[in-house]
């Protein structure tokens, strides 16, 4: 029976409390996550430089200063190509980092990225206009599976087990971890090769 339809003043929180007191199941409507729409079709990473994934993490120093961590991963070779560790990272910072990587490795076919404010800045949009951008819808981090796996390892194996006394200390520790990830850690998906070794063997 709809109490509102019959003219009753209804307080939904009070009704939920009364239902709970009577042992009745309270159904709570949850907001659906907003799902965005990719601006270009999904592109499979079938060779090196097909798709670079970009994402951010956050940590802090022992004094409470926030630290931003940018990671760029090649989805095919699993290499961590580069990144930035700083108190703040702008779209221009990211564009400059991508320029450096493009000069060293060549341009990627696609740039898979989160829709964060840094990534939609004018500087990034201008750079990404030269590639086929692939946007990951907000609230759907699993769509960016390769870089999400990488930053999960970075979180569990580096950020969660280290205290950073300064920004430079954070840069050093994170840099060492990324180097070991690329050169020492074998990946089953790469035939138990390290990302660096596999990248050197890629001819397709």
Predicted regions and their residues:
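Charged DNA-binding/catalytic regions of mobile-element recombinases
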Residues: 1-204
């Amino acid at each position: 029976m709809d109490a509102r339809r019959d003219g009753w003043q209804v307080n939904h929180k009070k009704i939920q409390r009364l239902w709970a007191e009577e042992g009745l199941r309270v159904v709570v409507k949850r907001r659906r996550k907003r799902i965005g729409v990719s601006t270009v079709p999904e592109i499979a990473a079938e060779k090196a430089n097909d798709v670079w994934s970009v994402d951010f993490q956050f940590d802090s120093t022992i004094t409470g200063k926030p630290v931003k961590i940018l990671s760029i991963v090649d989805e095919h070779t699993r290499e961590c190509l580069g990144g930035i560790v700083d108190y703040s990272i702008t779209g221009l910072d990211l564009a400059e980092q991508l320029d450096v990587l493009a000069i060293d490795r060549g341009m990627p076919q696609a740039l898979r990225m989160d829709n964060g404010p840094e990534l939609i800045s004018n500087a990034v949009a201008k750079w990404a206009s030269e590639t086929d951008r692939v946007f990951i819808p907000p609230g759907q981090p699993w769509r960016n599976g390769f870089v999400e796996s990488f930053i999960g390892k970075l979180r569990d194996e580096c950020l969660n087990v280290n205290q950073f006394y300064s920004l430079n200390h954070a840069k050093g520790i994170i840099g060492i971890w990324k180097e070991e990830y690329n050169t020492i850690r074998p990946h089953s998906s790469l035939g138990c090769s390290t990302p660096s070794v596999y990248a050197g063997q890629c001819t397709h």
